[in-house]
Amino acid sequence: FKMGDSVCIMRDGKVVQTGTPEELSMQPANDYVRDFIQTADKTEVMSVKNIMITPSRIVRLGDSIDRAIQEMSRNNLSSVIVIDSALRPKGMLFIGEAIQARKEGKAIAQVLQTGINTIAEDTLVSDVITIATESSYPIAVTDTGGAMLGLVTKASILSTLS
């Protein structure tokens, strides 16, 4: 599958399916194609846009600490991803640090855990595995302008491998 952008699978001299390796992997035309694809490493043909998840809650950089704490408490979350006004991921905010920041009168930007990794939506899953294993945070999937589209977690990668 690494040999071309488009793949044609034939059986008995007839075209069964044509498409990108990712299309064949995600939408095999029939059992023949499915069996053929079965031997391929899905992480080598599948992009992260197919495994990313939508975060249950996000907080904006300009939001108040109180609002961030309310979002996390109301949704039983220990952390949230923080984005700026252009939807670019800026980092993670943890409930304990947010509560401490409220006591000290600090803003989200002052207690935000930066260093969140970002990847493009067309990045292959195989290229993200090492990043995910070395990161304490989910990986933000972004568009060409840097706006967040979703997250890749260790769990979403593991479900692809199974």
Residues of each region from the PLM?
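Bateman (tandem CBS) regulatory domains
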Residues: 44-58, 94, 104-116, 123
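ABC ATPase "signature
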Residues: 15-19, 27, 92, 151
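The conserved cystathionine-beta-synthase
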Residues: 58-77, 82-86, 99-102, 117-145, ...
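A short, surface-exposed alpha-helical micro-motif characterized by mixed small hydrophobic
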Residues: 1-2
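C-terminal boundary and immediately downstream tail of ABC-type ATPase nucleotide-binding domains
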Residues: 26-51, 162
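Conserved short hydrophobic beta-strand within the ABC ATPase nucleotide-binding domain
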Residues: 6-9, 13, 24
